[in-house]
Amino acid sequence: MSKQKYERKKPHVNVGTIGHVDHGKTTLTAAMTHVLSLKGYADYIEFGNIDKAPEEKERGITIATAHVEYESDKRHYAHVDCPGHADYVKNMITGAAQMDGAILVVSAADGPMPQTREHILLARQVGVPSIVVFMNKCDMVDDEELLELVELEIRDLLNTYEFPGDDIPIIKGSALQALENAEDEEKTKCIWELLQAMDDYIPAPERDIDKPFLMPIEDVFSISGRGTVVTGRVERGKVRVQDEIEIVGLTDTRKTVVTGVEMFRKILDEGEAGDNVGVLLRGIKKDDVERGQVLAKPGSITPHRKFKCEAYILTKEEGGRHTPFFSGYRPQFYFRTTDVTGVITLAEGVEMVMPGDNISCDVDLIQPIAMEQGLRFAIREGGRTVGAGVVTEIVE
């Protein structure tokens, strides 16, 4: 992928295709790169190259994901497409490819299918902010009424999972026709309409630097004559000298004031999202803070023990468990920088969980962690990853 020709002046948005197997997600991805490449807005990536996506490791889990990029007049898009259903589930739960918006692909010939429903539910659970719909294979349906029926079904399904089904743009077309006739204005109209819908409907994400300050603590040092320094990578926002901050998690929340910020031994006025910094804290002893806590803007995040989550349990082949587990299972939950033991309670009617399953369950931790909806974690047994999850709701 030639990086030079992309101007980074345009705002950047992350998207991905979701939908049932064989409804045309990968064909659409290829068609978009082909059609847009003719206008210099993308490099054409062929279907075969997207379909045999390389496997990547994210939190110890192997996920096959294809990444393509393209532009519209207004934006630069990074777009992910996964070859298999299991890859989608893992991708969305681990947040390996964070999505600011999703392109739901539904075959007009089949209408919504089980994985259509599952992907919409997952998008809702993991907090994908918005969805646009591409109704594919419309060339295979002669009956206008049938197309309308499928559209209504899709809108109903989106409403069921609390997406605004009545307002979501649904673009009709054929990805295959567009891919095979990339210069045909009529057959590629749907691709340009989709891009327009993405520009107009998917909101631009808030930049990490504009969010309230948060830094997971990785290490704690005592510097004689100066006090206690905690180090870590700023996850979001900025931190300045004289800022009042809170230390959240594991024990009672404490307030303190930043008396110094340094990076690579140099003194800074402020640290911002992405920086690895040392933060000097007023009146805090080395024993008052520990790895696993976070520094945060006061009131922006609170500690919790009980939450609901969506989790994927690794297969034996992925290095996970060899046997099922039941309600009352007590693994460690690795949040940001530390493990905390917790108890899993399975949903009613669920007897047990097999390796390879994805589940919704309740967790009760033995210590509180600074937590919010959308926080990712790994499930571990003695340092070995056996699952991955995302907080979908805080209970207390």
UniProtKB/Swiss-Prot annotation:
Mg(2+) binds at residue 26. Monomer. Residues 19-26 are annotated as: G1. Residues 60-64 are annotated as: G2. It comes from Flexistipes sinusarabici. This is Elongation factor Tu. InterPro entries: EF-Tu_GTP-bd, EF-Tu_GTPase, EFTu-like_2, EFTU_2, G_TR_CS, P-loop_NTPase, Small_GTP-bd, T_Tr_GTP-bd_dom. Signal peptide: none annotated. Belongs to the TRAFAC class translation factor GTPase superfamily. Classic translation factor GTPase family. EF-Tu/EF-1A subfamily. Residues 136-139 are annotated as: G4. Keywords: Cytoplasm, Elongation factor, GTP-binding, Hydrolase, Magnesium, Metal-binding, Nucleotide-binding, Protein biosynthesis.
